[in-house]
A protein has these predicted regions:
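Sequence/structural signature of outer-membrane beta-barrel proteins
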Residues: 1-6, 39-41, 108-110, 176-180
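Transmembrane beta-barrel wall of Gram-negative outer-membrane proteins
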Residues: 1-2, 8-44, 87-93
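A short, structure-level motif marking secondary-structure boundaries and short turns
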Residues: 2-3, 70, 139-141
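Short sequence motifs at beta-strands and strand-loop junctions characteristic
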Residues: 9-13, 69, 73-81, 144-150
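Surface-exposed loop/interface segments of Gram-negative outer-membrane beta-barrel transport/assembly proteins
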Residues: 36-69, 133-137
């Protein structure tokens, strides 16, 4: 999907895929599935209020240069990639009993990048700048906020059906690891 967007600087470039393969036996079914995608979208998260006469105006990434001219940061974007893998196995053990199992793994990695004005140095773990013996406590900067995650696990169910009675026993075990961190790319 690609779009220039309705709101200024709100374009979208997204790609995705889906692949599935399987084995179908008399009493066995095995399927492998993978799907995922990437996206780069320019930020328009604030939307447009109904009172605003400029219906497509997007304030995100706006700053004023040293001459007081309005400028917009070119890479005010959200960038993310996620991939899923699944392996499913169903086995009919007899006419009354079947077993379903699945393994899954998801990998996600991405960031958003934005221009921030008048931010305190200490918010970003930076020492204040000293210019001509004057300590500056705030600055404009470009930052990235990252999401780096892994999620995997297994599920199962054992199903018994006989004499108008159905019983299911199942469970799952999952593990998630995620890290959120930031990077300062540029400071004025």
């Amino acid at each position: 999907i690609t779009s220039d967007g309705f709101i200024d600087r709100a374009s979208v470039d997204m790609k995705s895929y889906f692949v599935s393969a399987g084995y179908y036996g008399e009493n066995t079914l095995v399927k492998f599935i993978t799907f995922g995608g990437t996206e780069k979208t320019y930020q328009a998260w604030n939307g447009v209020d109904i009172e605003n006469q400029e219906r497509t105006f997007n304030e995100l990434g706006m700053y004023f240069d040293k001459n007081g001219n309005t400028r917009f940061y070119d890479n005010q974007t959200d960038n993310y990639n996620q991939t899923h893998y699944q392996l499913h196995w169903t086995q009919e053990l007899n006419s009354k009993l079947n077993l379903n199992t699945a393994l899954h793994y998801t990998r996600g990695l991405g960031y958003y990048e934005d221009y921030k004005t008048a931010r305190k140095y200490k918010e970003y773990g930076l020492e204040p700048a000293i210019v001509d013996d004057i300590t500056l406590k705030k600055t404009d900067l470009v930052r990235q906020k990252w999401l780096d995650n892994y999620f995997g696990g297994a599920t199962f169910s054992l199903n018994w059906n006989a004499n108008n009675l159905a019983l299911t026993f199942g469970g799952a075990a999952n593990k998630y690891y995620g890290d959120h961190y930031g990077k300062v790319l540029w400071v004025q």
